[in-house]
């Protein structure tokens, strides 16, 4: 969900939605009268409504499972919405007039060739794109965005850096992963090997808006904690800090290990509030700078 002084932007179903699958769409509500919010417009992907058919590329994954085409995470930047739309990939909408949202991107849909989650269909989580976060920018529109997956199969979801200078022709610049999770490939068995007993995936990202050129962001990574990623060179993302919380061992049903989910930076206090979805509550952090390349040696200059 996102909101401004007059409107709320939220994913949800409608009377026209297909009932047998998860098909949330964008709903824009005016709350000029807070006691009586009013739906002013909607946006959906063709195929989400009863009587419609999905485009061929939005039907099945390479493993034969059904894709999930559903609105999930919304980011507002001036007069545009940047939406992670699960197996549809990403959507950019111009909301200069919120009652008439207009799609202005040419699509960036990577399922197929990737599965949203190779483990689906099953109970649990999750297909495809989770967060589509534009970087801080000096001009009227952003040129770089972070796109994260969310799925727990092996290999798990990871992150992408996207050039969105020309939204109708978005370009993948690089990907980023977590050492020890995404890089463990068994060449003899021809498959990835992932940690047991935990859920390993990227989740929500949030840029550090104190960095004026938008080159530092905080990436929640479930069992791998909070990671600070620097993209001064967007072709080569670099991890420059991390915080891995204790394993609280509470084990909410359906969850495994740490569940570092969302970072919420407060730029006035210079603090980052981080949530844990497996009973770990709220952790308050402060980013103090880049990790040293090696421990300092006393007395050496």
Which functions belong to the PLM regions below?
Residues 1-301:
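Feature marking well-ordered beta-strand scaffolds used for ligand recognition
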């Amino acid at each position: 969900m996102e909101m401004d002084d007059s409107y709320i932007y939220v994913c949800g179903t409608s009377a026209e939605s297909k009932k047998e699958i998860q098909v949330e769409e964008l709903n824009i509500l005016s709350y000029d009268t807070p006691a009586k919010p009013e739906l002013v417009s909607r946006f959906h992907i063709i195929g989400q409504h009863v009587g419609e058919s999905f485009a061929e590329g939005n039907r099945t994954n390479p493993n034969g499972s059904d894709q999930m085409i559903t609105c999930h995470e919304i980011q507002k930047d001036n007069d545009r919405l940047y939406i992670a739309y699960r197996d549809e990939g990403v959507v950019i909408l111009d909301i200069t007039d919120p009652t008439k949202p207009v799609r202005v991107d040419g699509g960036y849909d990577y399922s197929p060739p990737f599965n949203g989650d190779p483990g689906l269909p099953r109970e649990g989580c999750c297909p495809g794109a989770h967060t589509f976060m534009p970087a801080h920018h000096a001009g009227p529109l952003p040129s770089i965005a972070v796109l994260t997956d969310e799925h727990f199969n092996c290999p798990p979801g990871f992150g992408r850096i996207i050039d969105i200078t020309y939204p109708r022709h978005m370009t993948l610049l690089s990907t980023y992963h977590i050492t020890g999770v995404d890089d463990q490939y068994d060449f003899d068995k021809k498959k990835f090997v992932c940690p047991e007993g935990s859920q390993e995936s990227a989740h929500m990202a949030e840029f550090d808006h104190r960095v004026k050129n938008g080159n530092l962001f905080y990436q929640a990574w479930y069992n791998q904690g909070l990671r600070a990623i620097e993209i001064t060179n967007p072709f080569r993302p670099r991890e420059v800090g991390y915080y891995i919380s204790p394993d609280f061992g509470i084990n909410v049903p359906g969850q495994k290990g740490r569940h570092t989910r969302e970072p919420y930076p407060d730029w006035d206090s210079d603090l980052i509030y981080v949530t844990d979805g497996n009973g770990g509550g709220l952790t308050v952090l402060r980013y103090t700078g880049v990790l040293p390349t090696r421990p300092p040696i006393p007395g050496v200059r």
